Amino acid sequence: MQFSSEWSQGFSAQWAECAQSRARIHRTLHDMCAMFTDQDEVSRLAAGGQNPLIYEVSAWDAPSQSGALSFGVTVLHPGQIGSEYYMTKGHYHVVRNTAEVYYTLSGEGVLVTENEDGQCILLPMAPGAASYVAPGFAHRMVNTGSQP
């Protein structure tokens, strides 16, 4: 299937095929070391030459016009650093009034959201579940299972 990036007319795409054709962002333990609280474990793994792949993102750049919706596929691998599960870096949107939807294709975990006042909400993630991140909330995924 040919992926069409004709944003002005809409498009349909197969997730797996499109994800393989896009440039990926790879986040390893080296990239994520400050995100984990067990810095002794991070140092031990680094000293042993271990730099596991934590997650990968394949994203499509939407036009910069108002109302455009970008989307992508994130593969969050299973694993732990000390007692913490692998997680994404997390972020606020540059335009704070932007929402986001996550649709879980496989695996299980939690979508952690937090607003600027410190209100934290945990949203369960499982195959077939859609999770809505409200505008103004930072968010990160945590893989609590054994599958990506």
Question: Where are the model-predicted features located?
Answer:
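Active-site region of the double-stranded beta-helix
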Residues: 17-127, 144-148
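Histidine-centered metal-chelating micro-motifs
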Residues: 110, 130-131, 135-140
